[in-house]
Amino acid sequence: MADQLIRATAAGGGIRAVGVITTDLTAEAQRKHGLSFVATTALGRSMAAGLLLASSMKKEGSRVNLRIRSAGPLGGLMVDAGLDGTVRGYVEHPAIEIEPNTQGLPDVGRAIGPGYLHVMRDVGYGQPYTSTVELVNGEIGDDVAYYLASSEQTPSAILLGVYLDRQGVEAAGGLLIQVLPQAARDPELVSLLESRISHLKGFTQLLRSGKDLPEILEDLLGDLDLTILAEPRSLRFFCPCTHQRMLGALKIFGAPELRDMIAKDQGAEATCEFCSEVYQASIEELEELISDLETAA
């Protein structure tokens, strides 16, 4: 199943649902960064969460940043996701591996450890909206659900999953169910949803069973006037970094430091944190940057 996002409503518009398949883009992140099993799972869940949050934004070009700063072995992570379906991200210590949990699965909570989740929503103008919450357990899903409940006052359930073996990422994705204000006043509806979600066996198991997103939503909300909205949106791992952007970033070092790079290294090398692309700057390019800086001074 191709990476995609679908939206749906139920209960007369009182329930909002968004589902994403992120298998290929999670595999791409694993390949680009050389991620361990537990780092792949942590970043894969976080990228799915970022795309789910970005889906609620209205203005073209809007993006959501998720940053986790924590004390665990992974050292935190960063995700940048857009309404357009693009996402990128990285883990501070991508190669770290730890013992699996008692179920034999990657122990994301222990690998992340205690810390904070910072969420920034940027619509492309004005000041971005930012919010910070303490991590609940480092498993990503519960942490994002807590952010939604505390910062946006929206009762939400978020299911995130990544399944991988030694051949790579087999399945990844997520599901966000939100009870909107008009429906949140119906305790029976809220209780019914909570019961159904609690009985799900895990999102990745549903994907591995061969069910697609509409089928999963039908099982969960089909008797509540489920409506699938429009066509699926394609998703992909994408980083806008370029050689020219790298050269622009080098200017912040200033002319003296650039001269030092020429003298000591005969050029410069920069690696993009988000996609691990390596860029080289020649002596001639550094000299041109120095000239630009001195002309502007």
From Swiss-Prot:
It holds the Pfam family HSP33. The lineage of its organism: Bacteria, Bacillati, Cyanobacteriota, Cyanophyceae, Synechococcales. It is found in: Cytoplasm. GO terms for molecular function: protein folding chaperone; unfolded protein binding. The gene is hslO. This is 33 kDa chaperonin. Signal peptide: none annotated. One of its GO terms (biological process) is protein refolding. Under oxidizing conditions two disulfide bonds are formed involving the reactive cysteines. Under reducing conditions zinc is bound to the reactive cysteines and the protein is inactive. It comes from the Bacteria. The keyword Chaperone applies. Redox regulated molecular chaperone. Protects both thermally unfolding and oxidatively damaged proteins from irreversible aggregation. Plays an important role in the bacterial defense system toward oxidative stress. Belongs to the HSP33 family. Keywords: Chaperone, Cytoplasm, Disulfide bond, Redox-active center, Zinc. Disulfide bonds join 239-241, 272-275. GO terms for cellular component: cytoplasm. Its main location: cytoplasm.
